[in-house]
């Protein structure tokens, strides 16, 4: 009987990597950690979900099942790619070395990413633009709903979608036209993440390191997936949760846990 070869590795989420910008990302420190794993004789790097957490921060509560987290984009990488200058980062280098101020990181990084996206629009090469167009076409099946949801989120002051007007009253060509630049930048963020992630993954694989990923069991209520497909979840007529996810009492938590995701409508 053949068995899988014995392997070992380390669980360390990307955000837990050290770095000067308040939160770990898929930049130089991630490549360095690959080197460390290789030198230790490890072959696996386990990480938590990489999805776009929005303002929730929790990797198990994501805005989209498919979109990746722009907060994990390497700012140093954006400098190397020509979309940022070192001067752009001077105003965000005053972080604590032992604690993460998530709100500050969230605010600062998205301001910097906005600058990078503006520079991408202005100066990306023809070859890069072709890759970007191909990325958008290949991922249209989820990207179109994601950018629409995020645009409506912005227009509704980041409020939960159950407080919005009905979809047919919100969605129209005018919204797309009036927010075209914002929408384009959402696409660029997703593209930049994938470009950087593929470089990290390729480097890790060359060093004999494979990633062990993770995905949430359920889908977050305030997500594009539930907003666009409410019939797939246990919701009432107002979009509120009828049955939610959780965990019964166990050794780790005598009271049990409420996770807050809507249950699936298996029918």
Each model region followed by its residue ranges:
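Short alpha-helical segments and helix-capping/turn motifs at coil-helix boundaries
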Residues: 28-35, 134, 195-203
């Amino acid at each position: 009987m053949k068995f899988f070869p014995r392997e070992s590795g380390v669980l360390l989420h990307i955000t837990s990597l050290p770095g000067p910008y308040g939160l770990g990302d898929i930049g130089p420190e991630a490549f360095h950690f690959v080197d460390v794993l290789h030198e230790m004789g490890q072959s696996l790097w386990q990480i938590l979900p990489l999805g776009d957490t929005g303002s929730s921060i929790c990797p198990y509560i994501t805005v989209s099942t498919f979109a990746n987290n722009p907060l994990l984009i390497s700012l140093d990488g954006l400098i190397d790619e020509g979309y940022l200058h070192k001067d752009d980062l001077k105003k965000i280098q005053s972080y604590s070395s032992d604690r993460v101020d998530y709100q500050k990181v969230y605010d600062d990084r998205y301001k910097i990413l906005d600058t990078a996206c503006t520079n991408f629009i202005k100066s990306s090469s023809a070859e890069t633009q072709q890759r970007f167009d191909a990325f958008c076409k290949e991922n249209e099946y989820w990207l179109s709903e994601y950018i629409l949801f995020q645009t409506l989120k912005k227009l509704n002051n980041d409020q939960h979608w159950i407080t919005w007007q009905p979809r047919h009253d919100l969605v129209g060509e005018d919204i797309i036209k009036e927010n075209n630049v914002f929408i384009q930048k959402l696409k660029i963020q997703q593209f930049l993440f994938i470009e950087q992630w593929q470089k990290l993954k390729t480097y890790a694989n060359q060093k004999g390191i494979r990633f062990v990923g993770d995905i949430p069991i359920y889908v977050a209520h305030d997500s594009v997936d539930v907003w666009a497909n409410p019939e797939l979840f246990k919701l009432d007529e107002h979009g509120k949760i009828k049955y939610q996810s959780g965990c019964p009492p166990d050794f780790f938590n005598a009271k049990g846990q409420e996770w807050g995701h809507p249950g699936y409508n298996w029918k």
